[in-house]
């Protein structure tokens, strides 16, 4: 059963430039093999997000939380938590996103990358306008097993992106 999730779009679209700084403390790497995919690359000048790539120090910080995420609802026997970890759903969610033929039209003129982490879908990149961002968020939220969608999308060229940028890209 889908639970309603409050719309986070307005607040997240206004995220500050502090979020856009590259991570300090070493090379970034996708330590946990979280699904990370480019859905579109139509908007020139849109910086590639760091996505799930983090430093060694950040990996150590995340490890404990990630080990526990999703086990509470599974242990309670909730019907939408058949897997023992929320991260076990991620590959299937990413496959559903790749297979969704309707996303192509939704993303025209944008550059969007997706990260899936523990049934949460992060949409990062640059879109034409708020309507396109809202359509993408609705489409992603409708996919099976997605608990939350977090849109970190730049609406206007020249503004700092509301996400961490992958250094050197």
Task: Report the location of each language-model feature.
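N-terminal targeting leaders
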Residues: 2-8, 13, 19-169
């Amino acid at each position: 059963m889908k639970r309603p999730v409050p719309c986070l779009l307005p607040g997240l679209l206004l995220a500050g430039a502090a979020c856009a700084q590259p991570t300090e403390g070493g090379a970034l790497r996708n330590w946990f093999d979280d699904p990370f995919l480019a859905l579109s690359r139509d908007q020139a000048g849109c910086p590639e997000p760091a996505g799930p790539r983090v430093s060694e120090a950040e990996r150590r910080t995340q490890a404990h939380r990630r080990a526990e995420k999703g086990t509470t609802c599974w242990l309670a026997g909730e019907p939408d938590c058949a897997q023992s970890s929320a991260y076990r759903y991620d590959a299937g969610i990413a496959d559903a996103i790749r297979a969704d033929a309707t996303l192509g039209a939704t993303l025209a003129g944008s550059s969007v990358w997706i990260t899936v982490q523990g049934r949460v879908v992060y949409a990062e990149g640059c879109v034409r306008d708020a309507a396109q961002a809202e359509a993408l968020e609705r489409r992603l939220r409708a996919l099976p097993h997605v608990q939350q969608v977090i849109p970190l999308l730049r609406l206007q060229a020249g503004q700092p992106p509301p996400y961490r940028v992958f250094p050197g890209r």
